[in-house]
A protein has these predicted regions:
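Helix-biased detector of long, well-ordered alpha-helical tracts
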Residues: 1-351
Length: 351
């Protein structure tokens, strides 16, 4: 009989890197996917979004007015409370459906779990995730669990959308305003918390942001006819911004002074706190990034910071900006104007 791990225990002690900071670097992932070559290029026409070019989720056209969205996301724990971990992991996985402009139908759990932890811990993770899936309008329909010394949890999510009303990474045009719907800094705050350098209130602020769904923001964008958006997660604001810029063939210019930061995040960044994932993000954007000489180093760190369950980044045509912001305000979705889209070589700038 396996001896159970002493209680109480800390989930974060069982992993070196939690949340979206554990994602494989975008540069290495791109290299791996490039090796697929003709296999990615040979997808059927019904696959609207897949590997070539990549987007936030796979989308398959079923009929003229129905497309099915499929996505998958999981990671090690970044908080110690099991139910909260389940909520955050679920919100993060569900976000890719919303980032495509879809509605959630159902989800399946993906879990890796140490045999020497009490089963009740896994129950709480499942319960947190199930509640969040219900909040998103779907249901948790099953899943698969394996043994693993390092716990991991996430979801495979199936959603639906009208194929002509999808949000995509491409489609941004010069003059569009860049809106962001969640403040930045979850990576540095979680990293700082592991070092005992974050107050309880600041950590609570990060947790509240991470378990907040992007559903209302996506609904507002789709209703306004917005087409260019993504969610900001493990590759950071600049990494995901660069993906949009490349997909659109445009230059994204972010106003560093306008970047919203979660309470405590800038102070930690200024003190040199950074996740391991941030180094991957810096390498990914290095050849396509211009940073203004006057931009504070802490803001550069914040712009590279891997986000877990971050907000939506959208390119809004100027003639729709007022209506979009009104819709977001009615839905009580926080949002910030953080930059603009310009003509020119695809890339990102922090000015």
């Amino acid at each position: 009989m396996t001896a159970l791990r002493p209680s109480p225990f800390r989930l974060t002690d069982l992993t070196d890197c939690g949340g979206c900071a554990a994602k494989l670097g975008a540069d290495l992932l791109a290299e791996a996917l490039a090796g697929l070559g003709a296999e990615a290029a040979g997808a059927p026409d019904a696959l609207i979004a897949g590997l070539d070019p990549p987007d936030d989720a796979a989308v398959y056209r079923v009929s003229d007015d129905l497309a099915i969205i499929g996505t998958l996301d999981f990671f090690p724990p970044l908080v110690d409370d099991p139910r909260t971990f389940g909520e955050i992991a679920a919100a993060n996985a569900l976000s890719d459906v919303f980032a495509m402009g879809g509605r959630v139908l159902f989800a399946l759990s993906i879990a890796a779990f140490p045999e020497d932890l009490p089963a009740g811990v896994l129950t709480e993770i499942f319960a947190g995730a199930s509640a969040k899936v219900r909040e998103a309008g779907g249901t948790l329909g099953g899943g698969h669990t394996i043994r693993d010394p390092e716990p991991k949890y996430g979801l495979a999510v199936i959603g639906a959308a009208h194929p002509d009303r999808l949000l995509r990474k491409g489609g941004a045009e010069p003059g569009d305003v860049l809106l962001l719907t969640k403040a930045l800094g979850t990576g540095v705050l979680v990293s700082g918390a592991r070092q005992g350098r974050v107050s309880a209130s600041d950590l609570d602020g990060a947790i509240d942001a991470m378990r907040r769904l992007n559903r209302a923001a996506a609904d507002a964008f789709v209703s306004a006819g917005i087409r260019a958006a993504t969610d900001v997660t493990g590759f950071g604001l600049l990494g995901h911004g660069l993906e949009m810029a490349r997909a659109s063939g445009r230059r994204f210019v972010f106003d560093a002074a306008s970047l919203p930061a979660l309470p405590g995040a800038l102070e930690l960044a200024a003190a040199g706190i950074e996740t391991g994932g941030a180094a991957h993000n810096r390498r990914f954007v290095a050849g396509s990034l211009d940073v203004g000489a006057a931009v504070a180093p802490a803001l550069v760190t914040l712009a590279h910071d891997p986000q877990t369950s971050g907000g939506l980044l959208a390119a809004i045509p100027s003639d729709r900006l007022a209506s979009v912001e009104s819709a977001l305000a009615r839905a009580r979705v926080a949002h910030w104007r953080i930059g603009r889209v310009e003509a020119g070589e695809a890339g990102v700038a922090l000015a």
